[in-house]
């Protein structure tokens, strides 16, 4: 890669000053400006948009304290069954390389008027949560509790830090060892809503679904979700359909293995996006016509008749007409 840090398309090359395997198949990357300059500020819960060596664009959450302006820290789980971005990061990037990144964005910010926080993380979903915890410890006196679910100790990212003195009495780490019957029982946590408490959950879709199911009686707006990537294999019955763009009249075909958002990009049509898992709301689009299978975790029931999250949701019938 070129030694110049300024790249095209809004990306800047940051130097990888350290790469460390912090758990089995999970790598931490520390990034800094090549000339030692301060980096653009970010807030807890933010993510970096990264152009990985194979050319893909991926989002990775920042895990360090936002007060640290001299570096960004991300963690990547190598997933051989994923879309290739994590494998390219794990296998092709080494300390000393330049990695193209865009300015941090945040669709998962902490609520300013909260009295306390409950954090739920699964697997690599710990990354934005850890940034939030570090921020709260360094800058506030607000109480919080983390429930972190992983398969086993070897797959637990940041385990030593979480069990250290800094977070004493604020962290519960649970291992299910691959047995669903041994999953953590969250009902005692969410049985009784607490005024001013906000819940932040990041992890695999089954974990988020479980938290969503158990918090239906909580006040609206008090439960927040974030996830990067979506497992389309859980929708084995995907069927192709068509999308008509209402403003231009363009017709697009959506195959079983591509999302509306991906097909728009393939055709040079820009649409806002961030998480690409139906949890942040960035790709909310007005629906003009059609019957939608809503797969997001954002839209309320009263919004589903005229809106769609184009990163995950699909058509129940043959054609959707969108206000694009």
Curated annotation (Swiss-Prot):
InterPro entries: 2Fe-2S_ferredoxin-like_sf (IPR036010), 2Fe-2S_ferredoxin-type (IPR001041), 2Fe2S_fd_BS (IPR006058), Beta-grasp_dom_sf (IPR012675), Cbr1-like_FAD-bd_dom (IPR008333), FAD-bd_FR_type (IPR017927), FNR_nucleotide-bd (IPR039261), MRET (IPR050415). Pfam families: FAD_binding_6, Fer2, NAD_binding_1. It catalyses: phthalate + NADH + O2 + H(+) = cis-4,5-dihydroxycyclohexa-2,6-diene-1,2-dicarboxylate + NAD(+). Residues 9-111 form the FAD-binding FR-type domain. The keyword Transport applies. PROSITE patterns: 2FE2S_FER_1, 2FE2S_FER_2, FAD_FR. Keywords: 2Fe-2S, Aromatic hydrocarbons catabolism, Electron transport, Flavoprotein, FMN, Iron, Iron-sulfur, Metal-binding, Monooxygenase, NAD, Oxidoreductase, Plasmid, Transport. Pathway: Xenobiotic degradation; phthalate degradation; 3,4-dihydroxybenzoate from phthalate: step 1/3. CDD domains: fer2 (cd00207), PDR_like (cd06185). [2Fe-2S] cluster binds at residues 275, 280, 283, 311. NAD(+) binds at residues 115-229. The keyword Electron transport applies. Its cofactor is FMN. This dioxygenase system consists of two proteins: phthalate oxygenase and phthalate oxygenase reductase. This is Phthalate 4,5-dioxygenase oxygenase reductase subunit.
């Amino acid at each position: 890669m070129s030694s110049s840090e300024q790249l095209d398309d809004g990306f800047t090359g940051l130097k990888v000053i350290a790469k460390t395997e912090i758990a089995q198949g999970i790598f931490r990357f520390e990034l800094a400006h090549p000339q030692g300059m301060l980096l653009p500020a970010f807030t807890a819960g933010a993510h970096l948009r990264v152009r990985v060596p194979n050319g893909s664009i991926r989002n990775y959450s920042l895990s360090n304290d936002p007060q640290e302006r001299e570096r960004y820290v991300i963690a990547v789980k190598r997933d051989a069954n994923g879309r290739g971005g994590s494998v390219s990061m794990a296998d092709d990037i080494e300390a000393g390389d330049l990695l193209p990144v865009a300015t941090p964005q945040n669709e998962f910010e902490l609520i300013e008027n909260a009295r306390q926080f409950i954090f739920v993380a699964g697997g690599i979903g710990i990354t934005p949560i850890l940034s939030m915890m570090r921020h709260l410890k360094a800058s506030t006196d607000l109480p919080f509790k983390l429930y972190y679910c992983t398969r086993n100790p070897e797959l637990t990212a940041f385990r030593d830090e979480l069990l250290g003195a800094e977070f004493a009495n604020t962290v519960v780490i649970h291992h299910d060892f691959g047995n669903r019957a041994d999953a953590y029982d969250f009902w005692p946590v969410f049985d009784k809503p607490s005024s001013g408490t906000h819940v932040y959950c990041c992890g695999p879709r089954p974990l988020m679904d479980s938290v969503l199911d158990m918090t239906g009686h909580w006040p609206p707006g008090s439960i927040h979700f974030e996830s990067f990537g979506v497992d389309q294999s859980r929708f084995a019955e995907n069927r192709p359909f068509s999308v008509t763009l209402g403003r231009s009249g363009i017709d697009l075909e959506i195959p079983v293995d591509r999302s509306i958002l991906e097909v728009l990009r393939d055709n040079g049509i820009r649409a806002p996006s961030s998480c690409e898992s139906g949890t942040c709301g960035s790709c909310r689009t007005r629906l003009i016509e059609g019957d939608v299978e809503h797969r997001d975790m954002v839209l309320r029931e009263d919004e589903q008749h005229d809106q769609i999250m184009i990163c995950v949701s699909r058509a129940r019938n043959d054609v959707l007409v969108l206000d694009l």
